[in-house]
């Protein structure tokens, strides 16, 4: 049975956004609000009793130049593993959009997305980060880490703007965090999984092979990208909203030198920030979890207000149930583009897929979409089981859902 998240209370925040360079600043408005719903529990539910994990600042990071946008220290949340998972490590890269110009990076540095001064001192560990076997059957007793995201460039930039007092040091944050975790035991890991959601899911794809090289040859190392398959596709006006955004990020934050050279040897740097141009070249096993009708991409790169001045897409972008037949056909075309983007990638036995026909975004950290009694399924397999089967080589997993509206197990996000 489909479960809808009725989110009318945040519609105003989603619709009212500042515009910069001709498109909505969705990187600090809409995506934040979508990802703030990541836990998948009602706080008033009797079952809402998640593990709370404290923030650790990386004390040696400053001397390495590894700092947030505002110059504060980066951080992570670590919950130690035990028993059979004591020597296994799961690193979750936080998502949260991007900043592509001075104006919205200055705005961002006054939030948890750009400064550890504003980060929560404790956060909930749910879904793939849960410490309960009944909620997270394969990874509950691993060392589980959530690396906070405060650089605005998917852990890939290395530059600065002195006039605006902005530090774009995502690549150095990544390295400093890995060094710190290695010193805390990760260097001896028998098993490791790098995962991430949204902008963190993109970072997984960018950093996966580098992550593999941190370990000895006998360590099982794989990567999981959740809602990170951002497509280089035109918006409803024929414009290039997301390409313009990514070009700004790459240029402003000095990302070029930190992109995979196999890609930049034949494509421009902005193209090499798009996962579709990277995934087939990766050497490390990768699992992709993505909604075929990714709600962030619908709202912010396919049909943002800047590409829809007449408001024709307004109702559809907030509630798929209000889309016209023509709009649904357009979204089916987007799904087809996504499937074409993973066609070569899926031919490799080492890789895995879970692409469900839902209007969702980030399904691995939400408890209700990761593993629960009514979780989304494809061929009766929930996301958690699919990922576990793939990681532990219990089965080859290439799960692609039938087109909307066939899947009644979706937990669709509805904003009105």
Swiss-Prot record:
Keywords, in A-Z order: Cell wall, Cell wall biogenesis/degradation, Glycoprotein, Hydrolase, Secreted, Signal
Annotated compartments: Secreted, Cell wall
Any one of the GO BP annotations: cell wall organization
Active site: 198 (charge relay system), 294 (charge relay system), 361 (charge relay system)
Pfam family, one: PAE
Gene knockout outcome: No visible phenotype under normal growth conditions.
Job of this protein: Hydrolyzes acetyl esters in homogalacturonan regions of pectin. In type I primary cell wall, galacturonic acid residues of pectin can be acetylated at the O-2 and O-3 positions. Decreasing the degree of acetylation of pectin gels in vitro alters their physical properties.
Name of the protein described by the UniProt record: Pectin acetylesterase 10
Lineage: Eukaryota, Viridiplantae, Streptophyta, Embryophyta, Tracheophyta
